[in-house]
């Protein structure tokens, strides 16, 4: 993960770049919230249902907070934008696991792939923020990192309880590998891999 010197007033990202990233993050949070809400009725395990319901609520708050930040950066409020069609394909693959017996695949998609990926990007963005106009975004992303980490921790416990055989462990590993391939092909939530990302060329503040 790239680390940046936050002592410079200029920062790494322009206002316009920050807007694009926030729209990307909002897309991921909104899609994740909607797919998990749709899965609640399809999931037989009560503990998983209850945890999903709580996380749907918190992800809805994340979506709203990101959307409200946009007009403060001179952009239209509550807009979600995927970085590219390949990322949409990745998200569709996670969401399409709608069979009664697909709980393992659903949890793998969220807690082993999507949420850890978002945490990585949010954390990287936090290290690169402009200290003049970005403190509100810092607070939002800081909150998202902490809450998404808690989501992953609780979701991983639920997933591990379901992995009670070698066959189920193999199912989980194969699905994780498939999703990671799709995610890598998309370049991630902003269209770039977090580990390899370099700051985009500044395009101005208006």
Language model regions located:
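Acidic/His metal-coordination segments adjacent to aromatic residues that form catalytic metal sites
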Residues: 3-23, 82-114, 186, 190
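Amphipathic alpha-helical assembly/interaction segments
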Residues: 8, 67, 105, 109, ...
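Helix-loop segments that flank and shape redox-cofactor active sites
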Residues: 31-54, 120-137
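A structural signal for well-ordered alpha-helices, especially hydrophobic packing surfaces
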Residues: 33, 63, 67-70, 119, ...
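Conserved alpha-helical segments that form or flank metal/cofactor-binding pockets of metalloenzymes
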Residues: 50-91
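An amphipathic alpha-helical core segment
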Residues: 137-177
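Extended, helix-rich structural scaffolds rather than catalytic motifs
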Residues: 167-206
């Amino acid at each position: 993960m790239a680390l940046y010197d936050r002592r410079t007033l200029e920062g790494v990202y322009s206002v316009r770049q920050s807007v694009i990233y926030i729209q990307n993050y909002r897309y991921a949070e909104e899609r994740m919230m909607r797919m998990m809400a749709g899965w609640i009725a399809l999931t037989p395990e009560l503990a998983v249902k209850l945890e999903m319901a709580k996380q749907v609520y918190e992800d809805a708050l994340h979506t709203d907070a990101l959307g409200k930040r946009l007009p403060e950066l001179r952009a239209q409020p509550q807009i979600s934008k995927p970085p590219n069609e390949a990322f949409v394909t990745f998200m569709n693959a996670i969401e399409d696991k709608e069979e009664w017996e697909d709980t393992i695949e659903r949890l793998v998609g969220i807690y082993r792939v999507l949420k850890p990926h978002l945490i990585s990007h949010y954390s990287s963005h936090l290290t690169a923020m402009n200290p003049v106009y970005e403190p509100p975004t810092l607070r939002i992303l800081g909150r998202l990192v902490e809450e998404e980490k808690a989501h992953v921790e609780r979701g991983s416990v639920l997933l591990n309880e379901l992995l009670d055989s070698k066959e189920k462990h193999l199912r989980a590993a194969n699905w994780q590998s498939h999703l990671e391939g799709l995610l890598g092909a998309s370049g991630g939530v902003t269209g770039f891999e977090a580990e390899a990302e370099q700051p985009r060329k500044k395009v101005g503040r208006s």
